[in-house]
């Protein structure tokens, strides 16, 4: 219970609350949550995608590679990078592995590659189905890659990754319940009411349990895996996080800017 000092007006309380909500890096944008004994950081973007951006290269045509450089670039424009995370898997030169659209410009085409059978474990990006998160005229959506391509969508921003975690409220059937293949993982979901929600595990988790987080806890009928292990980094200064990639940097990066 909070006791108010005599003389503090209701108007002053309302003003203080408004100012608190307007603070950059506010903690209600990202928070720590626990689901089935696994700890996560959950971040919410605005339903219409306002403030959500994709970053890859700076004005010198060089990959940003880390969150601090994006935060510095935002600050130079008088803006604040509230949170950021890896936006999907990438090549050794930090280029996106699949479709990448930034500010309406397609900088990388969609990947339709299927690995040759018997050539070893299938990389996560190519596990079926992989998918595309995009922001278009009708808002944000996540679709399996083949469905996205058939619809010939022209998005404002888009990134391709894989595999899909949840498809039309069903967990991807390739995932194994109780799998011992556990690592830190990151993903994005389109959730109840059209909310855009990001999740990064702070503990090791398998694919099935990570997908279950999106479907059952975050209420996301469609969700996409972004990256795992050293690639599952996040920037949330309000929570004391500014991760560094184990791979020398990140490729495409989601950033929420105010």
Describe each PLM feature range.
Residues 1-11:
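Bacterial N-terminal signal peptides that target proteins for export
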Residues 10-19:
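Bacterial N-terminal signal peptides
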Residues 21-124:
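Zymogen propeptides
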Residues 57-62, 146-151, 201-204:
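Short, solvent-exposed aromatic-acidic interface loops
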Residues 80-81, 128-131, 162, 184-186, ...:
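Short, surface-exposed beta-edge/turn micro-motifs
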Residues 95-175:
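Active-site-adjacent helix-turn-beta-strand microarchitecture at beta-sheet edges
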Residues 97-113, 118-119, 174-223, 231-258:
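Conserved, well-ordered active-site substructure
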């Amino acid at each position: 219970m909070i006791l108010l000092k005599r003389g503090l007006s209701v108007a002053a309380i309302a003003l203080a609350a408004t100012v608190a909500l307007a603070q950059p890096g506010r903690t209600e944008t990202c928070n720590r949550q626990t689901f089935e004994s696994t700890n996560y950081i959950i971040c919410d973007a605005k339903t219409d995608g306002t403030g959500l951006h994709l970053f890859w290269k700076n004005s010198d045509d060089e990959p940003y590679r880390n969150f601090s450089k994006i935060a510095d670039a935002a600050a130079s424009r008088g803006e604040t990078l509230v949170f950021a995370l890896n936006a999907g898997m990438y090549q050794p030169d930090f280029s996106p592995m699949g479709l990448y659209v930034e500010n309406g410009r397609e900088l990388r085409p969609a990947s339709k590659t299927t690995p040759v059978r018997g050539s070893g474990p299938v990389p996560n990006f190519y596990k079926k189905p992989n998918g595309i998160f995009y922001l278009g005229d009708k808002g944000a959506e996540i679709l399996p890659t083949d469905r996205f391509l058939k619809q010939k969508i022209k998005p404002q921003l888009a990134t391709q990754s894989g595999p899909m975690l949840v498809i039309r409220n069903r967990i991807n059937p390739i995932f194994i319940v109780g799998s011992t293949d556990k690592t830190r993982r990151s993903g994005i979901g389109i959730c109840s009411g059209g909310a855009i929600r990001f999740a990064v595990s702070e503990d090791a988790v398998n694919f099935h349990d990570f997908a279950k987080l999106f479907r059952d806890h975050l209420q996301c009928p469609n969700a996409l895996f972004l990256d795992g292990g050293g690639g599952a980094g996040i920037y949330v200064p309000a929570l004391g996080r500014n991760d560094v990639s184990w791979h020398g940097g990140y490729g495409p990066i989601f950033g929420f800017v105010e």
